[in-house]
From Swiss-Prot:
Residues 622-690 form the S1 motif domain. Component of the RNA degradosome, which is a multiprotein complex involved in RNA processing and mRNA degradation. Residues 689-711 are annotated as: Disordered. The gene is pnp. Involved in mRNA degradation. Catalyzes the phosphorolysis of single-stranded polyribonucleotides processively in the 3'- to 5'-direction. HAMAP family: PNPase. Belongs to the polyribonucleotide nucleotidyltransferase family. GO terms for molecular function: 3'-5'-RNA exonuclease activity; magnesium ion binding; polyribonucleotide nucleotidyltransferase activity; RNA binding. The keyword Heme does not apply. This is Polyribonucleotide nucleotidyltransferase. It comes from Salmonella arizonae (strain ATCC BAA-731 / CDC346-86 / RSK2980). NCBIfam families: polynuc_phos, PRK11824.1. Its cofactor is Mg(2+). The keyword Coiled coil does not apply.
Length: 711
């Protein structure tokens, strides 16, 4: 019989329910977590045995949103969910990052976590619910896992921290921060902010970690009642004798190799040392496993780099702990793009472009939480040549999506409002060289490219990656880390922002025991580095260019009466389509009567504005217009007087004498002056050629609404 075990607890303004034992009983563990009608079903399956020769931990986290959760049917051709969206990929990474470091060293059994959103309240984002579910399922499973973790979203509204704000509250918040950690320590932070101070950001991290203890307590209570027996897994015994043999052959040579400052030369030398050491040892004893020897060599590498940093010696490339690598900043490097920049920091380089488009180019995202339009796009590409390798080139991988989102968060706070700058903006960062912190190089390059494109960003932004090496109470915070320092260190801490404050903060911690004091040191050191980089960037370009590129579309804005919108659009869009083709422009009309005309040629834009003004102009009784004969009938002629408006000249109003046959006086296409006699209630217009020719008044153009240009 089904025997569900349930735990409920209050979490800020929400009630959270954990339920297990009801569904997916063949999985290693399964939990249904709900938070005010948003429910996520999370399963964990772990293999009892590792695959032979497995030398890494194969953890897979899948996060999937089902449209039935929001009471909808998918809009795709096949009417079913397809490959993961960008949002789903980002949440899968959000779950993966804090749980991965909590599996023990040497555990290489395959583990898969699947989180499925099965019900959604539009006010409660499922990401925090999914993280809590993954933590609970892993803790229940008996798999070696040093959890549980808690997860919290922190907002900042009216100078107050808000725990797990609703979607409506987030719109008012200056901060959107997700923090995850164990009972003792913070493990992961992901955030975007409206240029907040270091102290405010750190306060949010501490607040979120304190508040999530209730989650950890609830999961521990559930595990006591429903947890499976802990696996009898033990790490392989350390072979001290073999470790000593490998160290005797390789340690001093690896120490020398890590004094080579050039990345490619260093890697080549390290590969030679490893290869020669493994060959020598396997020749002496053919029972030795090359993979095991490789792991021992990697541990020696890690120890060499870390011990030198902790001893206060220069880093791998000869820098001191707070030194930034050499910077090279260039703008306007590509002639036909709307904005471009080449940002180089040491052996990390990003070629970044900014492209301007119209509102029609904005991305419409059909998400579970509702449809939204994104007018700022940021794409990050990491080709294999950037690290001197060959590899597959194609659709973006999880890492590229994650790095692109982080870089976008770094720039978002300084982007202009749509009403001031009505363009869709796409930034693309091509990583041409990489040796640490390419996402932060993308932030710097994006700021430069946007200024080069004439986008009126509120301030320049720069990003920096910090690292940490910690042994016991001894620690060193490193500025502008290399790829090796990221890989061999204990923390990856990325901060982006302007001179005024922080716009994005991402933190991934691989060890427990990172204190508030260490985070404070890292944030303050990052601020110094950020200000240094901004100073160099400002020497290349210190303000947005006064005008956008000649190759970018210029958007002109005019306002028409809302009851005239139908006239400009026409039946089935016929008028606006014809206008677009005739003028060579892009025309967009909003519900409030705002008309945006985009054109790369100013004359085309002026022509389009004139045509719209003609269409929307009111016909004035008693006024004379230049018209064109469009139809001839027995009782008169129809004459177009501009703006798609047509009136009837009765046969009696053609001349000041009796007219027997209309075609004796008028021909199709003939231009004639006409006077407006009357516009009846149905909008029908009576015209007179006779009265127009009697008057000496010159022909008039329709009166036009005022226009304003938004560039």
């Amino acid at each position: 019989m089904l025997n569900p075990i349930v735990r409920k607890f209050q979490y800020g303004q929400h009630t959270v329910t954990l339920e297990t034992g009801m569904m997916a009983r063949q999985a290693t563990a399964a939990v249904m977590v709900s938070m005010d009608d948003t429910a996520v079903f999370v399963t964990v399956v772990g293999q009892k045995k590792a695959k032979p020769g497995q030398d890494f931990f194969p953890l897979t986290v899948n996060y999937q949103e089902r449209t039935y959760a929001a009471g909808r049917i998918p809009g795709s051709f096949f009417r079913r969910e397809g490959r993961p969206s960008e949002g789903e990929t980002l949440i899968a990474r959000l779950i993966d990052r804090p749980v991965r470091p909590l599996f023990p060293e040497g555990f290489v059994n395959e583990v898969q976590v699947i989180a499925t959103v099965v019900s959604v309240n539009p006010q409660v984002n499922p990401d925090i619910v999914a993280m809590i579910g993954a933590s609970a399922a892993l803790s229940l499973s008996g798999i070696p896992f040093n959890g549980p973790i808690g997860a919290a979203r922190v907002g900042y509204i009216n100078d107050q921290y808000v725990l797990n704000p609703t979607q409506d509250e987030l719109k008012e918040s200056k901060l959107d921060l997700v923090v995850a950690g164990t009972e003792a320590a913070v493990l992961m932070v992901e955030s975007e902010a409206e240029l907040l101070s270091e102290d405010t950001m750190l306060g949010a991290v501490v607040f979120g970690h304190e508040q999530q203890q209730v989650v950890i307590q609830a999961i521990n209570d559930l595990v006591k009642e429903a947890g499976k027996p802990r696996w009898d897994w033990q790490p392989e015994a350390v072979n001290d004798a073999l470790n000593a043999r490998v160290a005797a052959l390789a340690e001093s040579r690896l120490s020398d190799a890590y004094r080579i400052t050039d990345k490619q030369e260093r890697y080549a030398q390290v590969d030679v040392i490893k290869s020669e050491t493994i060959d020598q040892l396997t020749a002496e004893d053919d029972t030795l496993d090359a993979n095991e020897l490789g792991e021992i060599l990697h541990a020696i590498e890690k120890n060499v780099v870390r011990s030198r940093v902790l001893a206060g010696e220069p880093r791998i490339d000869g820098r001191e702990k707070d030194m930034i690598r050499g910077l090279d900043v260039r703008t306007g490097v590509l002639p036909r793009t709307h904005g471009s920049a080449l940002f180089t920091r040491g052996e990390t380089q990003a070629l970044v472009t900014a492209t301007l488009g119209t509102a029609r180019d904005a991305q419409v995202l059909d998400e579970l939480m509702g449809e939204r339009t994104d007018s700022f796009l940021f794409h990050y590409n990491f080709p294999p040549y950037s690290v001197g390798e060959t590899g597959m080139v194609g659709s973006p991988k999880r890492r590229e999506i994650g790095h692109g989102r982080l870089a976008k968060r770094g720039v978002l706070a300084v982007m202009p409002d749509m009403d001031k700058f009505p363009y869709t903006v796409r930034v693309v960062s091509e990583i041409t060289e990489s040796n640490g912190s390419s996402s932060m190089a993308s932030v710097c390059g994006a700021s430069l490219a946007l200024m080069d494109a004439g986008v009126p960003i509120k301030a320049a932004v720069a990003g920096i990656a910090m690292g940490l090496v910690k042994e016991g109470d001894n620690y060193v915070v490193l500025s502008d880390i290399l790829g090796d320092e990221d890989h061999l260190g204990d923390m990856d801490f990325k901060v982006a922002g302007s001179r005024e404050g922080i716009s994005a903060l991402q933190m991934d911690i691989k060890i427990e025991g990172i204190t508030k004091e260490i985070m404070q040191v890292a944030l303050n050191q990052a601020k110094g580095a950020r200000l240094h980089i901004l100073g160099v960037m400002e020497q290349a370009i210190n303000a947005p260019r006064g005008d956008i590129s000649e190759f970018a579309p210029r958007i002109h804005t005019i306002k028409i009466s809302t009851d005239k919108i139908k006239d400009v659009i026409g039946k089935g869009g016929s008028v606006i389509r014809a206008l677009t083709e005739e003028t060579g422009t892009t025309i967009e009309i909003e519900d409030d009567g705002t008309v945006k005309i985009a054109a790369t040629d100013g004359e085309k834009a002026k022509y389009a504005i004139r045509r719209i003004e003609e269409i929307t102009a009111e016909i004035e009784v008693g006024r004379i217009y230049n018209g064109k004969v469009t139809r001839i009938v027995d009782f008169g002629a129809f004459v177009a007087i501009g703006g798609g408006k047509e009136g009837l000249v009765h046969i009696s109003q053609i001349a000041d004498k009796r007219v027997e046959k209309v075609t004796d006086y008028l021909q199709m296409g003939q231009e004639v002056p006409v006077k407006v006699l009357e516009v009846d209630r149905q909008g029908r217009v009576r015209l007179s050629i006779k009265e127009a020719t009697e008057q000496t008044q010159p022909a008039a153009a329709p009166e036009a609404p005022t226009s304003e240009q938004g560039e």
